[in-house]
């Protein structure tokens, strides 16, 4: 079972194992001031072999995905553009299928435009599934 507080604390202290992917960025000063979160630690997303933990700010609960509770994931992409533009805006997320039949949408709240977070999730979940199917514990 994933302990999100322990994962976030270990990553924040710079002690993340090589098998973890850690994403962080400085909190925007203006936005932090306006939301009343300027004293909060910076946003932090940690993807481990067991799941995902994300801290956004003190006003939001820690987001957790425990890979053991999933039955599958599906990559989803939607594109949009304006008629007078050659630029396409991509919206990328994962449909997360839970063992209890629920389906939810996963996209990092703080790193939504950094597609490598979705790639890291897919890689970690795939490795987790491979280890589990071989009867091993991912580490």
List the model feature ranges, each with a label.
Residues 37-84:
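Phosphoinositide-binding peripheral membrane targeting modules
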Residues 28-30, 53-54, 100-106:
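Short, surface-exposed beta-strand/loop "edge" segments at domain boundaries and coil↔beta transitions
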Residues 2-3, 7, 61, 69-139:
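Acidic, Ser/Thr- and proline-rich intrinsically disordered linker/docking segments
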């Amino acid at each position: 079972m994933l302990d999100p507080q322990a994962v976030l604390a270990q990553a924040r202290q710079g002690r993340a194992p090589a098998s973890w992917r850690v994403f962080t960025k400085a909190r925007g000063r203006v936005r932090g001031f306006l939301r009343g979160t300027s004293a909060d630690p910076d946003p932090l997303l940690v993807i481990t072999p067991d799941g995902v933990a994300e801290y956004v700010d003190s006003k939001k609960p820690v987001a957790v995905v425990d890979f053991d509770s999933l039955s599958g994931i599906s990559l989803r992409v939607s594109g949009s553009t304006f008629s007078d533009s050659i630029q396409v805006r991509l919206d990328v997320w994962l449909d997360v299928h839970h063992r209890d039949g629920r389906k939810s949408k996963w996209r990092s709240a703080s790193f939504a435009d950094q597609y490598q977070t979705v790639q890291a999730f897919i890689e970690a979940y795939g490795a987790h599934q491979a280890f589990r199917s071989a009867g091993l514990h991912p580490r």
